[in-house]
Regions:
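Terminal alpha-helical anchor/extension segments at protein ends
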Residues: 1-115
Length: 115
């Protein structure tokens, strides 16, 4: 009945979120490999880019410390950056947490130096 339909819709929506998260992480990885001045990662480096309004999309692991997450989201909102929460339910999401400290950003423009 209706309950099953709602449950199925939730599963589909969760799947769509994962697809979107995966696409964002793939985009980040491609930029990192091919045009690394368009991305940055790590808490301090991302903070610097947020401070000058250079962040287009902020990627945050859902496993980040909540206070840190709140601070970064607030800074992103002040500059109009998009914020995407990325779960560790798939390889690229786990990699965000493991390799980049759970914090990365796709920039609005190429930075002069990486970081």
């Amino acid at each position: 009945g209706l309950y099953e339909l709602v449950e199925k819709a939730e599963d589909v929506l969760e799947g769509l979120d994962l697809v979107r998260e995966k696409k964002l992480m793939v985009r980040f990885m491609k930029l990192l490999a091919n045009d690394d001045r368009m991305v940055t990662y790590g808490v301090e480096e991302v903070r610097k880019k947020l401070a000058i309004g250079a962040v287009d999309t902020l990627l945050l692991s859902t496993e980040l410390d909540k206070e840190l997450m709140h601070e970064l989201v607030e800074r992103a909102e002040e500059t109009g950056a998009n914020v995407e929460l990325v779960t560790t339910d798939f390889e690229e999401g786990a990699q965000l947490k493991r390799a980049f400290g759970g914090v990365a950003a796709i920039l609005r423009y190429r930075s002069k130096v990486h970081g």
